[in-house]
Swiss-Prot record:
The lineage of its organism: Eukaryota, Rhodophyta, Florideophyceae, Rhodymeniophycidae, Gracilariales. Pfam families: Ribosomal_L18p. Belongs to the universal ribosomal protein uL18 family. GO terms for cellular component: chloroplast; cytosolic large ribosomal subunit. This is Large ribosomal subunit protein uL18c. It comes from Gracilaria tenuistipitata var. liui.
Length: 105
């Protein structure tokens, strides 16, 4: 059974989705139903015209990117939503990169 995680205005939700090829991260304000910031391997791929693989290194880069975007918007604390995936591998790499950039959850 899946538990619903909801963010607040002061503490939005960092939602992570992992597919076989890509990883996506979104900062969502659930009170207004708005996506505040987003980052994925597809966005980084199109910006840099480089091939980013689906490994932990790519997840670390996405974590750094979403953390920089959230700091630019003044967001210091988030609620981490890993969508019932285990805290391991790419999910863990993304979370650690976000924490290294100074975002708390």
């Amino acid at each position: 059974m899946k538990k619903k995680i909801r963010g607040t205005k002061n503490r939005p939700r960092l939602c992570v989705f992992r597919s076989n090829k890509h990883i996506y991260a979104q900062i969502i304000d659930d009170t207004n139903n708005k996506i505040i910031a987003t980052s994925s391997t597809l966005v980084i791929l199109s910006e840099q015209n480089k091939k980013i693989s689906n490994d932990c290194h790519a997840a670390h880069k996405i974590g750094q990117n979403i953390a920089q975007k959230s700091k630019a918007l003044g967001i210091k604390k988030v609620i981490f939503d890993r969508q019932n995936k285990i805290y391991h591998g790419r999910i863990k790499a993304l979370a650690e990169a976000v924490r290294e950039e100074g975002i708390e959850f």
